[in-house]
Amino acid sequence: KLLKEKGVQARWYVLGEGELREVLLRQINRLGLEKDFILLGAVENPYPYYAQCDLYVHATRFEGKSIAVQEAKILGCPILVSDCNGNREQVKDGVDGSVCALTPESVSTKIEELLENERQRKIYGCRSAEALLMEKPDIKSLFWN
């Protein structure tokens, strides 16, 4: 809602199922954001969504090693994550993505900054894929044969 109030146009695709889906749906409706959010549920192949995104946002209070963040990295998505243990281990702030506090103001400010800076998003996307390939060179065979 903060982004919409600032005039930032964004469409959110939410993939996956979870116990908070109904809570999220109610929040979307309460804030009048029905046209801005698309809740797709579980999808067989999430990669086309990663490929089309301008920014992958992973805002969570707690996280271990996130497979979704790894997928976004290998597919070259610019990434914004919230500041928690697992996320900090996967994304180096200002190097291969951006890390911010998990507050509406901080997340919305970072999203706005990144959406306005295409060059920075491209840098983060390239670096995130490179970083993952350096860490796990064998992963390349899973995506490119």
What feature does the model see in each segment?
Residues 25-41:
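Nucleotide-activated donor-binding/catalytic signature segment of Leloir-type glycosyltransferases, i.e.
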Residues 42, 61:
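Aromatic "clamp/platform" in nucleotide-sugar-dependent glycosyltransferases that forms part
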Residues 47, 66-74, 88-89:
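Short alpha-helical segment that forms part of, or immediately flanks, the ligand-binding pocket
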Residues 71, 84-94, 98-99:
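Short acidic/histidine- and often glycine-rich active-site loop of Leloir-type glycosyltransferases
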Residues 93-94, 98-104, 113-118:
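Conserved acidic donor-binding segment of nucleotide-sugar-dependent glycosyltransferases
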Residues 134-145:
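C-terminal alpha-helical cap of glycosyltransferases
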